[in-house]
Amino acid sequence: MSAKEVDFERESHLHAVMCFLTGQSGEKIVSIYPHRKPATKAPSKDPQPSSSNPGQCVKPVLTSVKDPSYGFGRVDTEFDMSLGMLAYVFKTQEIACNDGFDMKINNQRFVAYPKTWKARGESTNYQISIVFALKNGCEQHTASAYQTLSNKIAVSLVMLQNYFGFLEREDKWADNAEEPNKDHPLEEFAKTSFIVQPLAEMFEEVRNRGNIHKYLINFVELGFCDEAHALTKLNVVPKGRQEIDEIVRKMKPYHGILLLEDVWPTPDANPIVAKLLSHCSPDRSILDMSTASGIPIFEVFMIIRHLLQWTRAILIYPLCNTNIYTSATSPQPLDKMAEKFTAQFGNTIHLAAGLAHFNPPKTLDTFIRKNLPLHEQGVRAKLVVALLRHQMLMQLHQFYYILKPYSIAILPEPKEPCPAEFTKIIEESTLPNDVKGVVADICAEMLETTSYASVKRTLSLFVKVAPMMDGNHHLEEIKYKNNLDRTEIEGVFVSFKLVIATFRRPDFVAE
């Protein structure tokens, strides 16, 4: 797939937002943003009869009936329906309230989560619903996310109604905007309403940034994130909610994070978040951040989970000189990224230089060389971080298989047979039968130059990690799950390299 096939400039799936309200005067849509005028259509020609014989039957033609409604109902929309028609469609039976709806009208998708409300001192149930019009092609998890946002807003409005009659007041102002002497009910209602402006601001924030964090009517806190759109805006390959949830589920203490933008919390935020962010660094793992900050590892996981789900960070492996990187295979907006890197680094180093160095794959220390001036080392380190942040580099990890030696391999020829204790360990292990004999010979040959206890330790570790040597677990995961030292486990793999096949690929959880 070429970069041209991926639209990194795509807009959000959000197309419009409407406020549906029922009250004493009936149902109506009191707000639509943005209000786009209906597209002009060519005038239709009256069908002509196929015969001059007036008695011959002519095929009937369906025509749209003029909507007789008034006020908000007579306002035309881009959806080939007036607001009155849409209000009739959106009205939900009371039994279906407090549940999401998802419908298509004229190939346009509408989602919402209607809620019921009551006027103070009355028993009649009315409805409030924030309806989102979504573009074609959005995935189900995106539609579900906007249903959740609709529910959050509606719940907030109902709560405000219970506190001080908020929706009663809005309904009264909507009735005033529909008076016969007022030709533009939407504009009239917007002059007094406390709903219209917040909905417009939310719409713009989602389209511009992909997420919302604000107080509705300066009273109720609301949060929302369209993950794929937010990542696209940050020039990162977009991921949906399901992909991000899968990453969160597989997150381990040996992972690290890279912040995608300035996420320093507001003054009223939890001070633990600020404390953790002050210890956040590309060369630190989650466990390192927990140790340095003194925050329990579980709490660190919860904060990082929040950052990932709100597209404020991506998961990486901590920077280390032995890390192996290569240029990413996913399509990238190279022209836009070149401009961004030029603005950040100027003429000191070019984007292409960083990408070219790691193709073919190389370790980090070959790029950030110790013989370079400290300033140059710092610039190159920042370049690598920027490339990782925008997922233009990916790290390759070492994976392992246990395989029978090749036919041309030089097999061990020990002078003494393998001890019975070692043979028993090998026979009771999960090692493939076709390599057990070779492993026994390797142990016997090792005893010629190494102590018995050392060989037993090496064999025991090899047998212990063998179930994970199936090509699905890389070195870091093997080391972590078995609580082993990296140098020691690498020594074990070297000792039994005759029956081990290795290969490198990305860890798709983090990439």
UniProtKB/Swiss-Prot annotation:
Subcellular location(s) of the protein: Lysosome membrane
A Pfam family per the record: NPR3
Disordered, as annotated region: 37-58
Assigned GO CC terms: GATOR1 complex; lysosomal membrane
Keywords from the UniProt entry: Lysosome, Membrane
Ranges annotated as spanning the membrane: none
GO annotation (BP), single: positive regulation of autophagy
Keyword Membrane attributed: yes
InterPro entries: HTH_NPRL3, Npr3
Function: As a component of the GATOR complex may function in the amino acid-sensing branch of the TORC1 signaling pathway.
Quaternary data: Probably part of the GATOR complex.
Family: Belongs to the NPR3 family.
Protein name, entry field: GATOR complex protein NPRL3
